[in-house]
């Protein structure tokens, strides 16, 4: 959450969890901890409330069924699905996929072998493998155009790529060493 707030000026962040008390407590804690970013962080009453008029929808769940109604996603939204990394799990409602202008992954090969968010709709004939355009790297390198207009719905599916995790860990390690933080094991 903090990374998103640091990267982009967000006015309002709605959070939803099936456990209402946990959701409320998390929203309150994040409102205090992340106040410097100026966003209002509030618990949503349900997943539909959470995505209503949302420009950015981020799902981070281990769900085996969709966590929001894909027909309610507004034009121009970006959806980032982080939680489903197994073929039987899908937090993304397949109903949004035919409306999506672009479906991008961290790794197309990994996503097409690991996430039910794509495998289930492909098996059901809702989309094809060709509808999955490529990787985020392809967007960054200009092989695939990013957002081309304010009406596009863009879906980003991430299953995790070990090489990216290692690079991130190395950057964090180097910064910790430079700042004199942490400790060395075995010394």
What do the PLM-derived regions correspond to, one by one?
Residues 62-65, 84-85, 110, 161:
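Short glycine-rich anion-binding loops that position phosphate/pyrophosphate groups of nucleotides
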Residues 58-61, 81-82, 106, 169:
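Short, well-ordered coil/turn residues at beta-beta hairpins
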Residues 95, 126-187:
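NAD(P)-dependent dehydrogenase/reductase Rossmann-like domain
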Residues 7-34:
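NAD(P)-binding Rossmann-fold cofactor-contacting core
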Residues 40-49:
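Short acidic-hydrophobic, aromatic-tinged amphipathic segments that line or gate anion-handling sites
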